[in-house]
A protein has these predicted regions:
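Alpha/propeptide regions of enzymes that mature by internal proteolysis
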Residues: 1-217
């Protein structure tokens, strides 16, 4: 997908391993925030998992699979073996989106009532072969979110009451950059890096959403 970055997908997890540390911004449950990571994990867990055990589950998985440290970890009840992987390029920038999509708890931000955490979710890992500035990394999180919402609308996802979706109640995003290649001061949707990221995310999430809906018709 991207040189010196390996992606492993199976029924247990989506794993990204990097030969050199990636610069990462994420909302991950383990290792989230802004930092560096040699591995990214999106671990499948039971739908009724006790959220207090998620950190320990991720740590046990990391040990068993011998993941390099530091690592960033997410969890999902969606089928990880059905992760959608899309790569897009713009100018000298390459972006890969890896999305797992579960839509059993869709929400409309600002309308849906507060609720307990659930692992059925949309998790989006984005790999960028470029050198975005810290502010651009944050900007890319917004770009990923915009593309995700549009993908759901395009796929025809709606809440039971007909409201438009913004995602699910527990969506998570990871944006990880190699730090090599072109410098990117901005990450909006019409920059080279933002354009590549948005197209990859929109395609990956859209395909995953349509597949989820079709399986339940």
């Amino acid at each position: 997908v991207i040189d010196a970055v390996a992606v492993e997908i199976d029924a247990e997890a989506v794993v990204v391993r990097a030969a050199r540390p990636l610069v990462v911004v994420s909302s991950a449950v383990a290792g989230g925030g802004l930092g560096r990571a040699r591995a990214l994990v999106n671990l499948r867990v039971p739908r009724d998992v006790d959220c207090a055990t998620v950190g320990a589950r991720l740590a046990e998985f990391a040990r068993r699979r011998d993941l390099p440290t530091p690592w960033v970890g997410l969890c999902t009840a969606a089928a990880t073996e059905r992760a959608e992987v899309v790569t897009e390029r713009a100018d000298d920038v390459t972006a890969t989106a890896i999305a797992t999509v579960g839509l059993s708890n869709p929400v409309s931000a600002g309308l849906s009532a507060r609720a307990a955490w659930r692992p059925a979710t949309i998790n989006t890992l984005v790999l960028v072969d470029a050198a975005p500035a810290p502010a651009a990394l944050v900007n890319l999180v917004a770009t990923v979110t915009e593309a995700k919402v549009l993908a759901l609308l395009d796929a025809g996802v709606r809440l039971p009451d007909g409201a438009l979706p913004s995602g699910t109640s527990t969506d998570a995003i990871v944006v990880a950059a190699t730090g090599r290649g072109p410098a990117c001061p901005y990450g909006g949707p019409v920059t080279a890096v933002g354009w590549a990221v948005a197209r990859a995310v929109r395609a990956a999430v859209g395909t995953g959403a349509r597949r989820w809906l079709e399986a339940r018709r």
